């Protein structure tokens, strides 16, 4: 019975052009990457779908630090953080990140997690106790949605970036613990949440803000410290979650918050307590990555990323209008080209791959029905010539479609 049910579900996904499949990367994460299917030869594709925004995943200094960390600490941690798996490298990483966020969060401490998904789940389940209310942005990442579902708190959703609707919900709430939960840079749209206004509402209504800055950390701000630095925000009411497997180029995530909140997470957050700690070598590599992000090279890489974004948007503006597509209102590394139909998005992605370019087609349920899209992501490792090559391939795909 179970297998028949699952086969029927698979057939339904296929009929709706919603089947997902994995590809195999044969080389390091980089703009030009060898990609193949299981049992087939790989081919080199110009890739615009990774989240390696600063091009650090293949940086020689980060790789060298990873090797050095493995030689010093071994391949694995051997236990959870609260048993014997918390290494000097983990402690040094948390201390360095706490320094970064001291200007923005009173009595800042940080806590390192194996993944961003775990960090989001941990914060919402540990703080979303019975009697609390989570006020969740409608386009939050799946990990925030799942964390809210597992929390014992009441959950109320507000429309995308609609601070008036949120204010009404906050004003009507009698909850003793209120948490506003939002992405900073929305992962499928690339736009930035109105965090300054959200913080004003939090202070007015005695609420706290949980900010998932997965796509802003390392990229936004003069030093790459993320959205709080970029907007000049500071408050003890901020609970910041940053990802270390995207712009930082390695793996994991962290929570930055008031020391009392971090201590609560250490003692009550099940995704932190009941899992083996990440390899210390990963934390050691991240220290090298953070030094690059904060230094002159990081500034240069962010400037290169900004040039690539400007080149792409200039070219896509005309192309999207002529093709009947919608270019999302994004100034970040995430550039959504909304096609609408699932099949059309898949066909466009396939046409690009036939031309040697890899861009993922994003479909429901990841995005709302009728908004299937190409999610184009840029990296500082891309050149402006790479971006122009993508624009040429998109133009050719449009011409081919019109000729048919």
Swiss-Prot record:
Keyword annotations: Biotin biosynthesis, Pyridoxal phosphate, Transferase
The family this protein is said to belong to: Belongs to the class-II pyridoxal-phosphate-dependent aminotransferase family. BioF subfamily.
Alphabetical list of Pfam families matching this protein: Aminotran_1_2 (PF00155)
Pathway the protein takes part in: Cofactor biosynthesis; biotin biosynthesis
Subunit description: Homodimer.
Single GO term (MF): pyridoxal phosphate binding
Biological processes per GO annotation: biotin biosynthetic process
Protein origin, superkingdom: Bacteria
Entry function: Catalyzes the decarboxylative condensation of pimeloyl-[acyl-carrier protein] and L-alanine to produce 8-amino-7-oxononanoate (AON), [acyl-carrier protein], and carbon dioxide.
Top enzyme class: transferase
Coiled coil: none
Gene label: bioF
N6-(pyridoxal phosphate)lysine PTM sites in chain numbering: 246
NCBIfam families xref list: bioF (TIGR00858)
Reactions catalysed according to its record: 6-carboxyhexanoyl-[ACP] + L-alanine + H(+) = (8S)-8-amino-7-oxononanoate + holo-[ACP] + CO2
SUPFAM superfamilies recorded: PLP-dependent transferases (SSF53383)
Cofactors named for this entry: pyridoxal 5'-phosphate
Organism: Cupriavidus taiwanensis (strain DSM 17343 / BCRC 17206 / CCUG 44338 / CIP 107171 / LMG 19424 / R1)
InterPro entries found in the cross-reference section: Aminotransferase_I/II_large, AON_synthase_class-II, AONS_Archaea/Proteobacteria, AONS_Proteobacteria, PyrdxlP-dep_Trfase, PyrdxlP-dep_Trfase_major, PyrdxlP-dep_Trfase_small
Binding residue positions for substrate: 20, 141, 366
Keyword Ion transport carried by entry: no
Residues that bind pyridoxal 5'-phosphate: 116-117, 187, 215, 243
EC number(s) stated in the UniProt entry for this protein: 2.3.1.47
Gene3D superfamilies referenced in this protein's UniProt entry, alphabetically: Aspartate Aminotransferase, domain 1 (3.90.1150.10), Type I PLP-dependent aspartate aminotransferase-like (Major domain) (3.40.640.10)
Stated name of the protein: 8-amino-7-oxononanoate synthase
């Amino acid at each position: 019975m179970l297998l028949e049910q699952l086969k029927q579900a698979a057939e339904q996904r296929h009929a709706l052009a919603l089947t997902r499949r994995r590809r195999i990367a044969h080389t390091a994460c980089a703009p030009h990457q060898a990609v193949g299917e299981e049992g087939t030869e790989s081919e080199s594709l110009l890739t615009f779908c990774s989240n390696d925004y600063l091009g650090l995943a293949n940086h020689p200094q980060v790789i060298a630090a990873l090797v050095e960390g493995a030689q010093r600490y071994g391949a694995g941690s051997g236990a959870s953080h609260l048993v014997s798996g918390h290494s000097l490298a983990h402690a040094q990483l948390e201390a360095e990140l706490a320094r970064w966020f001291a200007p923005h969060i009173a009595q800042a401490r940080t806590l390192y997690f194996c993944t961003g998904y775990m960090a989001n789940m941990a914060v919402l389940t540990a703080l979303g106790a019975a009697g609390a209310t989570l006020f969740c942005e409608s386009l939050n990442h799946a990990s925030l949605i799942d964390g809210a579902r597992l929390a014992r708190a009441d959950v109320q959703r507000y429309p995308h970036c609609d601070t008036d609707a949120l204010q009404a919900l906050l004003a009507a709430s009698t909850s003793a613990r209120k948490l506003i939960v939002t992405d900073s840079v929305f992962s499928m749209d690339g736009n930035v949440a109105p965090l300054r206004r959200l913080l004003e509402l939090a202070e007015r209504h005695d609420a706290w803000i949980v900010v998932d800055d997965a796509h802003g950390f390392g990229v936004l701000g003069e030093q790459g410290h993320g959205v709080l630095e970029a907007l000049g925000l500071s408050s003890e009411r901020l609970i910041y979650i940053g990802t270390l497997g995207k712009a930082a180029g390695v793996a994991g995530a962290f929570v930055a918050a008031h020391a009392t909140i971090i201590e609560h997470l250490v003692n009550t957050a099940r995704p932190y307590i009941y899992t083996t700690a990440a390899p210390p070598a990963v934390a050691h590599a991240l220290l090298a990555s953070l030094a690059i992000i904060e230094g002159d090279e990081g500034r240069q890489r962010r400037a290169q990323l900004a040039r690539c974004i400007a080149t792409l948007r200039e070219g896509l503006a005309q192309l999207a209008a002529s093709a009947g597509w919608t270019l999302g209102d994004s100034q970040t590394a995430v550039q959504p080209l909304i096609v609408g139909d699932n099949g059309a998005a898949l066909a466009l992605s396939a046409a690009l791959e036939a031309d040697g370019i890899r861009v993922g087609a994003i479909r429901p349920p990841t995005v709302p029905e009728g908004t299937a899209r190409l999610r184009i992501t840029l990296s500082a490792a891309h050149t402006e010539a790479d971006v122009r090559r993508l624009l040429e391939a998109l133009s050719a795909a449009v011409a081919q479609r019109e000729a048919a």
